[in-house]
A protein has these predicted regions:
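Short acidic/histidine-rich motifs immediately flanking catalytic phosphotransfer sites
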Residues: 42-50, 66-72
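Short glycine-/small-residue-rich Rossmann-like dinucleotide-binding loops
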Residues: 53-54, 77, 181-183
């Protein structure tokens, strides 16, 4: 897929790691890199798996890696609670890095949104608007939910997420956190967090201009996992030192 080709481009330009093989429904070759139809077809179960497939593919990758002692970076969105439970079980046996968005910039946005939530202390209404290409299947995006969950955690869990305002004709409640989705064209990924007060609006924005940022983050995560003990790791763990300066 597109992320697979982007990963090949990014990793090929580095000297601290290399691609052993790829996995895709269509087996074949990308340059000198063999591509297999499934993880089970790999000649050797070694290295670190980076997964950008689908919820079903992510669950399978987590189970395969747990069974073969392979660390994994799982980047797909749209996972159910049952899917996430499988991922957490895998993390008991191998290092698992999980994030719905591998962009370092998005994770800085999340930290800034946390800080703003604390500073405004419930005095501002909060809305999240996410925009993606017309082929994206899940809505709202996994990233929008990551942002909402971080805000809600900072606020003590008081917010109720509202996704569809047209079904109810009533004024906005103080405990609502609205999440709106836009799908169109080739938008890679835009996220805006709006803190709306009576006299002013503060907007924190992130715009992904290409898929390269996601690939870079995934490679950094794989390098971070090298040598880690089994466990469930996130961007917060990887960026802990840098986040302290915010």
């Amino acid at each position: 897929g597109r992320m697979g080709h982007t990963l090949v481009e990014k990793i090929s330009a580095r000297s601290d790691c290399r691609i052993v093989a790829g996995v895709d429904q269509k087996a074949g070759q990308i340059g000198d890199i063999p591509v297999y139809a499934s993880l089970e077809d790999l000649p050797e179960a070694k290295g670190i798996v980076i997964d950008f497939t689908s919820p079903a593919g992510t669950v399978h990758a987590a189970q395969f890696c747990a069974a073969h002692g392979m660390p994994c970076v799982l980047c797909s969105t749209g996972l159910s609670k049952e899917d996430e439970a499988v991922v957490e079980q895998a993390s008991e046996k191998v290092p698992v890095f999980r994030s719905a968005n591998m962009s370092v910039g998005i994770n800085v946005l999340i930290e800034l949104a946390r800080r703003a939530t604390k500073l405004f202390d419930g005095e501002f209404d909060i809305e999240i608007v996410e925009k993606h290409h017309h082929n994206k299947l899940d809505a709202p995006s996994g990233t929008a939910l990551m942002i909402a969950n971080a805000i809600n955690e900072e606020a003590g869990g008081k917010y109720e997420y509202v996704y569809d305002r047209h079904v109810v004709r009533q004024k906005r409640g103080a405990q609502e956190l609205g999440i709106s989705s836009v799908r169109g064209g080739g938008i890679v990924g835009d996220h805006d967090v709006l803190f709306c007060g009576p006299e002013e609006v503060v907007t924190i924005s992130h715009v992904a201009q290409s898929r390269g940022g996601f690939a870079d983050g995934a490679v950094q995560a794989a390098l971070f996992l090298d040598g880690c003990e089994p466990g469930y790791y996130t961007m917060t763990d990887m960026l802990k030192g840098k986040m302290q300066c915010l």
